[in-house]
Amino acid sequence: NRILSAEAGIDSQAFRTGALRAEDWEYLAMATEKLHDAPIYMDDTSGITITEMKAKIRRVNQDPTRPNVGLIVIDYLQLMTTGQRTENRVQEISSITRNLKIMAKEMNVPIIALSQLSRAVEKQGNNSSHRPQLSDLRDSGSIEQDADCVLFLYRDSYYASQNPDGGEVDADTAECIVAKNRHGETSTVPLGWDGAHTRFMDVDFKR
């Protein structure tokens, strides 16, 4: 729904509640047609394993009517399992991240894996400390170790809405924090935030 709302340029809240304007239906139809023909494959298998994922990707790549998979996005890492008995969740996540790295090399395809953060980042006290750090990655330090890049998305306005005494902030701005970059520098990149369509964008485009 979020992809369709963003592609159609329709307010995400109106999309969810069905409060659409007459012209929105035309935009929605065009976006639906465009996405229907897009080489995007979604799989909502719960508790999927690396082995199952590789098998599904190979089936797509072997289909002559489809383009090969060029990017894998996992939403999110903690929903995956190894399919084997492990002593604890930390070891299981470590095994998953290690095998994802191996799979990326074997299949020559980049992988973007979303991850939960620990609740500690929500409990920070001052205005700046809500910004996530590598130590906030949930369940395992192997995420930091195995990843080539670690990016955090952050919005001041998210925390300002929870703390009315925190002062005014720009609701249309966000940050992409490059916390790890194996092949380059770490930095913080300013972004625009389009809340109506639930998407981040280049600052210049937002203006």
Regions found by a protein language model. Name each.
Residues T45-E175, A196-R207:
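P-loop NTPase motor core
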Residues S187-R199:
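A short, surface-exposed beta-strand/turn
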Residues L20, W25-Y27, E33, A38, ...:
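Sparse, context-dependent recognition of short Cys/His-centered cofactor- or disulfide-binding micro-motifs
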Residues N1-N68, T82, T188-P190:
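Cytosolic-facing regulatory segments adjacent to core modules
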Residues E175-A179, G192:
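C-terminal helical "lid" of AAA+/P-loop NTPase domains
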